[in-house]
């Protein structure tokens, strides 16, 4: 089977995370969420200004894409959740 990247996107508070987690559980695929990564980064490094908050969000997106490329590069599939 070819590797697949499933994108779960939608408006804020529309149930993206819930749907992505359910898909992950049902399909046995890893799930990456920008918000989960951003929260981890915030807990680790924090931010003090709007500019730093934006940079944290960009960093979270880049980390999510990097992790997805690693998973896909090994021939596995992955679920990405964000408001893209």
Positions of PLM-derived features:
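Exposed loop/turn and edge beta-strand positions of beta-sandwich/beta-sheet ligand-binding modules
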Residues: 2
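Walker A (P-loop) ATP-phosphate-binding motif of ABC ATPase nucleotide-binding domains
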Residues: 5
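Hydrophobic anchor at the beta1->P-loop junction of P-loop NTPases
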Residues: 8
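The conserved Walker
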Residues: 12
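Conserved glycine(s) of the Walker
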Residues: 15
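Conserved substrate/cofactor phosphate-moiety recognition/catalytic segment
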Residues: 18-74
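Short catalytic-loop micro-motif centered on adjacent basic/acidic residues
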Residues: 78-83
